[in-house]
Amino acid sequence: MPDVKKNVIVNHSVDEMFNLVDRIEDYPLFLPWCGGSKVLERNDDITKASIHIKYSGVNQSFTTQNTKDYPSRIDLKLIDGPFKVLEGYWIFTKIHEEACSIEFHLHYEFSNFILDKLISPIFSQIANTFVDGFVTQADKIYKK
């Protein structure tokens, strides 16, 4: 099963980065592979949302429940979609008021062999550039 791990240090606060990741409804604005997103439920503890991947001929949607520990952690767990397994987390660690480290980990397995062969190379590319998209968007909206 593929694992994606990424660690970066950014010149943005943990609050800014946590909020950017939690605003799933904004993903289509800055993630080129995201063909749409819909928040199904949101409260202080969880965000349930569906994301539509529309990229390089792939047209798939999945739904996750994201358990939140503001502002330090978001855990992702699959509810529905073309995966047998999709789970991961974001960890935001304060370095000082205007900087933090971000640790992203994603573990996934597609539900069948055909999907794995068709979608896995594209999903791997998406997952490996995921954090970069958030850093670029944070630099843009927080103007640092």
What does each model-identified segment do?
Residues 1-45, 144:
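Hydrophobic ligand-binding cavity/cleft-lining segments
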Residues 2, 51, 60-64, 72, ...:
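One face of beta-strands
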Residues 6-8, 37-38, 62-67, 87-94:
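Hydrophobic/aromatic beta-strand elements that line small-molecule binding cavities or substrate pockets
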Residues 10-14, 53-57, 68-70, 82, ...:
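Beta-strand elements of well-folded, non-transmembrane domains
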Residues 14, 41-45, 67-72, 91-101:
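A short, structured loop/turn motif at beta-sheet edges
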Residues 38-79, 133, 137:
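Glycine-rich portal/gate segments that line the openings of hydrophobic small-molecule binding cavities
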Residues 78-129:
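Beta-strand/loop substructures that line and gate deep hydrophobic ligand-binding cavities in soluble
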Residues 136-144:
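Short, highly charged C-terminal tails/helix-capping segments
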